[in-house]
Each structure stands twice: as C-alpha cells, then as structure tokens.
Design a protein with these regions (language model features):
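Short intrinsically disordered, low-complexity segments
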Residues: 21-25, 38, 114-117
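Negatively charged, low-complexity tracts enriched in Asp/Glu with abundant Ser/Thr
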Residues: 1-27
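Acidic, low-complexity, intrinsically disordered interaction modules
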Residues: 34-100
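Active-site or metal-binding loop neighborhoods of secreted/extracellular toxin and effector enzymes
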Residues: 93, 103-113
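Assembly/interface hotspot detector across virion components, adhesins/toxins, and nucleic-acid enzymes
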Residues: 29-32
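Short, intrinsically disordered, low-complexity terminal segments
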Residues: 14-18, 77, 83, 110
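Short intrinsically disordered terminal tails
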Residues: 1, 112-119
Length: 119
C-alpha cells in the first residue's frame, strides 16, 4: 500500500500536533493521526453531519504554520471579543494591541516551535 507520509515526517507531525494541544481545548479543532495518509485537522463540528472542514498534512512545517495561524487567530478573536476591535480583521486587531502583548503572542510561536522540535 502506498504511504503518503514518511515515518520521519509522521513523527515530526505527531510532535506538532501534541505541541498545540491547548488549541483543541479552546477551539472546535481536532488533529488526528490518519496513518499512512498523514495527519488530518478536523474543524467546525456540526452534529449530526460531523466536521465541515478536513485538511490533510504530510509535512510538519506546513502543519505547524497552519496550527500556529489557527492558535493566533483564536487568541486575537478572544482578545477582541466584547471590545470595539470585535469587527476588525485579525491583522488590524494585532496592530491595535500594545507592543508587549504583540511580543507575548509572537513569543508563543517560538515556544510552540521548541515543543514541536521545529527549527
């Protein structure tokens, strides 16, 4: 049977998935190991149909970037909720934040990368 992900990338993807565990608690997202097919990000669960969105990853770098964007967007949404920033786009919200908060958020990327073993 054909494999769509190398054993090395599969191990790296597993580390990336584990690094973003907190995201799955705060957002309607789940990342699952789909064996020889890679890892699948399931998003927007709607009963009874199930997940509306499924993205398959076979490389850890693109999976990391995707989950990082998801995490950052979620944080920005939560920060803007109930404020005048609520109607803004994510980039606008980020620019409105104090420099310290911007740095704090961006430093989390380095933390996730270290946990995931991404250079």
């Amino acid at each position: 049977k054909e494999k769509y992900i190398t054993d090395d990338e599969r191990e790296k993807c597993r580390k990336v998935a584990d690094a973003f565990a907190e995201l799955y608690e705060i957002e309607n997202i789940l990342v699952v190991d789909a064996g020889r097919y890679g890892f699948v990000k399931l998003q927007y669960y709607r009963p009874p149909q199930g997940f509306e969105d499924a993205i398959t990853f076979t490389d850890s770098q693109s999976m990391f970037e995707n989950l990082w964007e998801e995490w950052l967007d979620t944080q920005l949404f939560l920060l803007a909720k109930g404020t005048p920033m609520a109607g803004m786009g994510y980039n606008e919200i980020f620019r409105c934040l104090p420099k310290e908060k911007q740095e704090e958020l961006m430093n989390r990327k380095a933390g996730f990368a270290k946990t995931a073993g991404i250079e």
